[in-house]
Regions:
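Thiamine diphosphate
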Residues: 1-59, 70
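Flexible, low-complexity linker and terminal segments
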Residues: 41-170
Length: 170
């Protein structure tokens, strides 16, 4: 766990094509098994923006937050904005947290810690993501019939594929 003045952003270097390792590697399943929410940036700018949100989400929820890093993103360069006002972090004040908070504490027995994680922390992270619009509809229509859900580098790949097919936001 974490504290309101701490926060943990756990970076995982995924290697889907096994370019740098003997086996392909994907962190999503390990993060999920450990009840760690995952942020997956699609660009160098999003590494900065979502990194700030990751620390804030960790502090708010008391959870570690996973950060999926793929070579196409982290081994690239870009011009980015470092304006401190670029990312508007909203710390929710309308979520029913336990009276003693969600932060790690000693000497709580492991069952109490696990119950706090399953009863509050996961939902606090989801609430943080909702309030800060971390998951959003990018292209909408009045009568949607089909949806594509994607994140990170695959978001850029899907947008490129749609563009290659001549499909735009209309």
């Amino acid at each position: 766990g974490t504290s309101k003045h701490g926060g943990v952003l756990a970076l995982a270097g995924d290697d889907h094509a096994a370019k740098s390792s003997t086996l392909p590697r994907q962190s999503d399943h390990q993060f999920s098994a450990a009840m760690i929410p995952v942020l997956y940036p699609s660009s160098v700018q999003e590494i900065l923006d979502l990194g700030l949100h990751g620390w804030a989400m960790s502090r708010y929820s008391g959870l570690w937050v996973g950060f999926k890093c793929v070579a196409d993103t982290v081994e690239s360069s870009a011009s980015v904005s470092i304006d401190p006002d670029r990312v508007n972090i909203v710390v929710p004040d309308d979520f029913p947290l336990p009276p003693d908070g969600v932060s790690i504490r000693w000497p709580d027995p492991f069952l109490v810690t696990e119950a706090r994680m399953q009863d509050y922390k996961i939902y606090a992270a989801l609430h943080y993501a909702r309030v800060n619009r971390l998951n959003r509809i990018v292209v909408d229509s009045p009568k949607p019939r089909l949806g594509i859900v994607t994140s990170g580098k695959s978001y850029l790949d899907v947008r490129q594929a749609l563009d290659d097919l001549g499909l735009d936001e209309r």
